[in-house]
Amino acid sequence: MGERCTVEGTVQSVVFQNEENGYTVLSLLTEQGEVVTVAGCIPYAAPGEGMTVTGVWITHPLYGPQITCEQVERRMPREEEEIVSYLASGILKGVGQATAERLVERFGTDTLRVLEEEPERLSQIKGITAKKAMELSKAFRELTGLRRTMEFMARYDLPVHLAVQAHRVYGAQALQRLREDPYLLAGQSFGVEFSRADEMALSMGFDGDSPCRTQAALLYELQHNQGNGHVFLPREKLLWAAAQLIGLPPDRVEMCLDTMVEQGAIRQEQVAGVLGCYTPELYEAECFVANKLLSMLRFPYGKVRGVDGVIEEMEMTQGIRYAPLQREAVTLAAQSGVLLLTGGPGTGKTTATRAIVHLFEKMGLDILLLAPTGRAAKRMGELCEREAQTIHRCLGMSYNDLTGRVTYKKGESDPLEAEAVLVDEMSRVDLPLMQALLSALRPGCRLVMIGDADQLPSVGAGNVFSDLIRSGRIPLVALKEVFRQADKSYIIRNAHLVNGGIGPDLKTNQGDFFFLCRRVPERMVSTVVELCKTRLPEKMGIAPEDIQVLTPTRRGECGTVQLNRCLQAALNPPSRTKNEKQFGDLIFREGDRVMQTKNNYDVLWEKDDGTMGAGIFNGDVGTVEEIDPSGELLTLRFDDRTVGYTADMLNQLDMAYAITVHKAQGSEYKAVILLAAPAAPGLLVRGVLYTAMTRARELLIIVGDDTIPGQMAENDRRTRRYSGLRRRLKEGGTQA
């Protein structure tokens, strides 16, 4: 098993078919007279049609030997008996066995051509009216259109499922649209790399300076740079990048850009002296966020009386004394519709947040606690002793196949019931998510946004939390005082040193902070492995699953790739009792810690209490619980959710014994081991070190070169993100 093969035959029966994604299990009668099971993306397969399947033999735990289809060439039925089987299979609604036999009896082997090209002749058959003849012909043309689109994709080695997607988006015009403009495949609906779509188009005879090529390059650069955090690109940068991508002079590209601006395909606006170019979606998102927040600030919430009394009551019952800024935060939360609460570790954000929640409870408000990640939501719920959930799940996020975009059940037409919403880890919230959240808040709802402005910005487009703070328009409480009990933590002390541009005190080596000097990368890695495998579990009672290794980079001797190889070998080595599955350079093994690396809005999960749902998101960390013997199905556990992954979903997973600091944003771990090793200059900066250190709850160990933490603390270089949100807020909002 596992051998590659190519078989040719005729479909005998269809065992299973998913009309949404084209996944099919069928029996194929080969030319040698054998019946084999084939599984894969073969949309609208039906008995009687011929096909040549290329794939890999596997053994399914329930269904035995079968071929996992990678590529398929299909041909329409040729013989009369095959045509009857094909039409009687249910492939055309309204055609059963008797009608299929009458059609073939009348038109013979010409039946399928008549269905497609001469539908008026179908009404010669008893029981088929002229109207029904046209309906049958239309349905058949759609099927043949899908088949031709599949053949078109296969010709250029593109996945067959893209044909299904193209027909969802463009219907019967799919093949024509793609032939006219293959660069459509590089758009959000399909996600094909521009270089691949470009290679395909040029091989089809498109000119290097065709308008559709230049337009696609401009949109690709805007969308690609959203992944780098930019909401817009300066016009000159966009022109240069697109020109470089397709090898044309910038002035040739500029003409196309002007046309796209005139047509509204790209939005253009002056932003702080720069002519910025936006995708329409991000332009509208930025305008909406600014306008919504400003309207919330203008909303007449009314004066709340007795706030001081509530604060004093909380102080008495909890035996604490709030600092002046904490009291101010509680008061502002009551009086203002929007509040920003920021501060570093140990400055009392959690205490202030709990006080605000208690005040809102006293006011009788319906309260929602939200965070951008599952770990952050769990932590927030524990600290506030209330249920908290992710923003995505609260808003009912899903994925729209037709547009290639995220959609939400909750919004302006169906807002949340909440009267007060508190959002933690705001530095992780990007512009599109902020737009979705604000659109779901009903008029009069209060919003408290909590976070640490000095942490790294969101992975997605925008610098929302920082922009809100720097705009000066949103009420802000910035907690700075480190409380006495927190000041005993060397993690917190050193984090504040780093945030002030001073390297951490590496000589501390007591309490919750330790530094182990290792200047050779091999020694750094071996020390990390030893800490995770033996020293921390045996000396400090910290289990390996409570330890997270962080490093600034994926690449290099101390990057996540190499660290994960070494940690997997030490913590979860091969065993006869553990099944495993190889995927590229990775070997997934039962017991492995893994991370989801892209949003999957459709994958189904089940909680321990039987609750069902969908969606596993970028950054979610889980454990491989079980791998079936064939390696084609993996059972993963993400906290209290169990999820089934098929082999074709493994490109969404990576090992997570070690992860990058960026991936750790919004999460907190009992123990963190941080690598201080050489890396790209853009990664050895203050924000990366500060974010990494503040991920540790009880123990932080830095392993590496003793010169690097100080260099990182001194380097406050921040990668610029092009965003106009701060300006829009300052200027009072802008209409989209």
Predicted regions and their residues:
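Accessory, non-ATPase domains that flank or precede helicase/AAA+ motor cores in DNA-metabolism machines
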Residues: 1-309
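Walker A (P-loop) phosphate-binding loop of P-loop NTPases
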Residues: 346
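C-terminal accessory regions
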Residues: 618-736
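Conserved helicase motor core of SF1/SF2 NTP-dependent helicases
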Residues: 355, 359, 363-365, 371-383, ...
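Conserved lysine of the Walker
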Residues: 349
